[in-house]
């Protein structure tokens, strides 16, 4: 046993260290590498020196029963004394089976947890550490509190593959990792805590003890608001990368609190309902944008502490802004300190690279056929809602989870039990995650980034769906951008590209997304996808944004689009805020602001987004003129007419059939001079006439500016 202790290879330290139940063995054994002496300290009694048993072992052979007695140890470190509680006197370090296997409670018990244990009538505060490493032959806790010496604090093998140890008097902010021996006794790289709530950056990547109970939330009004049906709400998401929205004068990151001070008033002014953060889970490589996470339970410390991130969410909520996080359950990186070969085995991924390795991203794929892995991920999703009060998660790369042959050639994948390409384990996990989120957090939303035609992504699980609240409309994004990039003179040949998305617009609960994916890897900015000279580019962009806000579906724009950013997104720099010195870009920003407020204030533009009753074509086949028109209809019967002219040719005396007799009042014109448009005179109040057009008995006459979208309300 001494040899195992000296090699940090002991799996049952409580059988050898601490107080003995059998007094014939002695009263106490202490293992303290590097100590020159150890003494027993009992309250109100003289100290008793322990004998040196081996090089690092000390034993007390006095006739004392310390099994139920609280005691301390006076450690002599070459003349420097340290008074500590012996962790091996605390046997009550386990938790109930259900607590360790139920996703809603797992994160309250695994990892490092502040707790108080009772011993000899005394309440002893400290931190309990639990880690799942079923194939390890030994696990030690190492950290700044023991000079990263794996011999000092061997952990006890408990049931169900879990190892545990309680360290008395350990404070918040202490760095730690796990030192393990693999199945054959081989040494492994120090591992960060998979359940760690806080982590250090390069080079240590160590986990840090953190107490969730300390932060005092101020968002009770937001958290207790009535449960609403999100499909009927106006949802406008501002997708944001925390490290590159703005920088300080030195070019450094804003921390979470500084970001809150700058961003929250901006979101309120611009009319966004939610901020959608690209992944904030701890990730070692900044250039991954967060999509290679190692610490799923820790908000990245690049921008501050977990308390600072809570402050950010709190500030958003107090201003009426919801917070959605990108969540990455599809894969994880191969960093030595992370989940890869965690206990010396592929604990979190399939050992067969055809199922366990993502060749495009050079990362491991979670083995969702393992119950513990599924529980780990579902627990993580619930954790962010519970501990950080987030309002939604956008699940990254869902298609890569659903299909076993995703981005794989013949022979590079293994079929399921029925010979097909669907990943049954991933499907079951996603369904379970959605059910758990909506069960415990009924006001939450889950959003899928899913790029295929997999059926029922946003259908309830009881109807056979995956159970997501919404799905990104990747088809709309692809088709609409493909259309708008064409020169106006060529758009008539691509008219179906613009109208086709309406064929399936209500097959899912869609979010129309112009995300970060469209402004990276040489794709350029949204602004610079537009054809023509500078004025035409901006006019096209304004018309396109108007078209987007008039279409059925919730809205998402990546940061920078709202100011007409011309450069491709660069994560190493802030947005091109200097562009707001120019009227054209001021106009794009002003238009985005007005579109958000219009979308939120007009029920017809959002409350039937997800059902066919909210949309009617008025003009869909005017390919030669590159004009489309439709009406959006609210539950209460309100109607808003949206007309887009995608050529630089103004249309005077343009007659359009309408189903209702009445007046159509102008709500918004993307070509308005206040948006740096041409200021072409438009009809402000169009009264219907009994003139047949488009097979409708009534019609109105409009003036359509070049490259524009107009919104009219029937009154």
UniProtKB/Swiss-Prot annotation:
Question: Where do the coiled-coil regions begin and end?
Answer: none
Per the record, its GO cellular-component terms are: cytosol
Q: Which GO terms describe its molecular function?
A: 1,4-alpha-glucan branching enzyme activity; cation binding; hydrolase activity, hydrolyzing O-glycosyl compounds
Q: Which GO terms describe its biological process?
A: glycogen biosynthetic process
Give the catalysed reaction(s), semicolon-separated: Transfers a segment of a (1->4)-alpha-D-glucan chain to a primary hydroxy group in a similar glucan chain
- Keyword Signal attached: no
Q: What is its EC number?
A: 2.4.1.18
EC class of this enzyme? transferase
This protein's pathway: Glycan biosynthesis; glycogen biosynthesis
- Which residues are named in the active-site annotation? 396, 449
Q: Which UniProt keywords apply?
A: Carbohydrate metabolism, Glycogen biosynthesis, Glycogen metabolism, Glycosyltransferase, Transferase
**Assembly description:** Monomer.
Identify the PANTHER family for this entry: 1,4-ALPHA-GLUCAN-BRANCHING ENZYME
Q: Which NCBIfam families match?
A: branching_enzym, PRK05402.1, PRK12313.1
Q: Per its database record, what is this protein's job?
A: Catalyzes the formation of the alpha-1,6-glucosidic linkages in glycogen by scission of a 1,4-alpha-linked oligosaccharide from growing alpha-1,4-glucan chains and the subsequent attachment of the oligosaccharide to the alpha-1,6 position.
> Which family does the record assign?
Belongs to the glycosyl hydrolase 13 family. GlgB subfamily.
Q: What is this protein called?
A: 1,4-alpha-glucan branching enzyme GlgB
Q: Which organism is it from?
A: Vibrio vulnificus (strain CMCP6)
| Lineage of the species this protein comes from | Bacteria, Pseudomonadati, Pseudomonadota, Gammaproteobacteria, Vibrionales
């Amino acid at each position: 046993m001494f040899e195992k202790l000296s090699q940090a290879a002991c799996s049952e330290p409580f059988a050898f260290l601490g107080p003995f139940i059998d007094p014939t063995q002695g009263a106490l054994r202490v293992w303290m590498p590097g100590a020159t002496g150890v003494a027993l300290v009992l309250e109100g009694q003289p100290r008793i020196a322990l004998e040196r048993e081996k090089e690092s072992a000390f034993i007390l052979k006095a006739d004392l029963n310390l099994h139920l007695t609280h005691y301390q140890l006076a450690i002599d470190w070459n003349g420097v004394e340290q008074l500590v509680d012996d962790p091996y006197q605390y046997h009550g370090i386990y938790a109930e089976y259900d607590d360790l296997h139920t996703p809603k409670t797992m994160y309250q018990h695994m990892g490092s947890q502040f707790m108080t244990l009772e011993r000899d009538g005394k309440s002893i505060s400290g931190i309990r550490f639990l880690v799942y490493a079923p194939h390890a032959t030994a696990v030690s806790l190492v950290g700044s509190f023991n000079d990263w010496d794996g011999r000092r604090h061997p952990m006890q093998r408990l049931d169900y593959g879990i190892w545990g140890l309680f360290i008395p008097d350990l404070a918040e902010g202490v760095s730690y990792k796990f030192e393990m021996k693999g199945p054959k006794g081989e040494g492994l790289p120090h591992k960060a805590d998979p359940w760690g709530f806080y982590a250090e950056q390069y080079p240590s990547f160590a986990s840090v003890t953190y107490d969730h109970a300390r932060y005092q939330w101020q968002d009770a009004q937001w958290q207790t608001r009535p449960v609403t049906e999100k499909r009927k709400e106006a949802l406008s998401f501002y997708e944001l990368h925390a490290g590159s929205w703005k920088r300080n004068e030195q070019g450094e990151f804003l921390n979470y609190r500084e970001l809150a001070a700058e961003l929250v008033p901006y979101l309120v002014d611009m009319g966004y309902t939610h901020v959608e953060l690209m992944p904030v889970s701890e990730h070692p490589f900044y250039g991954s944008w967060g999509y290679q996470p190692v610490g799923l339970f820790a908000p990245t410390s690049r921008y501050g502490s977990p308390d600072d991130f809570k402050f950010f969410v709190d500030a958003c909520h107090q201003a009426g802004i919801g917070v959605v996080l990108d969540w990455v359950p599809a894969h994880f990186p191969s960093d030595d300190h992370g989940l890869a070969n965690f206990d010396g085995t592929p604990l979190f991924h399939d050992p067969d690279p055809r199922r366990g390795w993502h060749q495009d991203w050079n990362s491991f794929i979670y083995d969702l056929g393992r119950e513990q892995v599924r529980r780990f991920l579902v627990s993580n999703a619930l954790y962010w809602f519970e501990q950080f009060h987030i309002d939604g998660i956008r699940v990254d790369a869902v298609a890569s989870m659903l299909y076993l042959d995703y981005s794989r050639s013949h022979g590079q994948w293994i079929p399921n039990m029925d010979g097909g390409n669907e990943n049954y384990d991933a499907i079951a996990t996603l369904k379970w995650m959605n059910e758990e989120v909506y069960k415990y957090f009924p006001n939450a939303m889950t959003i899928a980034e899913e790029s295929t035609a997999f059926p029922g992504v946003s259908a309830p699980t009881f109807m056979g769906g995956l159970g997501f609240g919404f799905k990104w409309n990747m088809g709309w994004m692809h088709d609409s951008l493909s259309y708008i990039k064409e020169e106006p003179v060529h758009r008539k040949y691509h008219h179906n590209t613009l109208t086709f998305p309406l064929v399936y617009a209500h097959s899912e609960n869609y979010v129309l997304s112009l995300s970060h994916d469209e402004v990276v890897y040489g794709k350029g900015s949204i602004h610079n996808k537009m054809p023509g000279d500078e004025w035409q580019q901006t006019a096209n962009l304004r018309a396109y944004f108007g078209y987007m806000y008039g279409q059925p579906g919730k809205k998402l724009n990546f940061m920078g689009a709202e100011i007409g950013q011309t450069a491709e997104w660069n994560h190493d720099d802030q947005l091109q805020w200097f562009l707001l010195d120019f009227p054209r870009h001021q106009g794009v920003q002003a238009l985005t602001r007005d579109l958000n407020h219009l979308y939120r204030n007009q029920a017809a533009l959002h409350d039937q987004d997800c059902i066919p009753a909210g949309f009617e074509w008025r003009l869909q086949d005017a390919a030669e003129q590159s004009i489309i028109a439709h009406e959006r209809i609210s539950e209460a019967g309100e109607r808003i007419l949206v007309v887009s002219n995608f050529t630089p040719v103004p249309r005077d005396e343009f007659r359009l059939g309408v189903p209702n007799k009445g007046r159509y009042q102008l709500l918004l014109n993307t070509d308005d001079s206040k948006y740096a448009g041409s200021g072409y005179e438009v009809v402000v109040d169009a009264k219907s006439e009994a003139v047949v057009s488009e097979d409708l008995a009534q019609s109105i006459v409009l003036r359509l500016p070049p490259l524009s979208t107009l919104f009219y309300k029937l009154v």
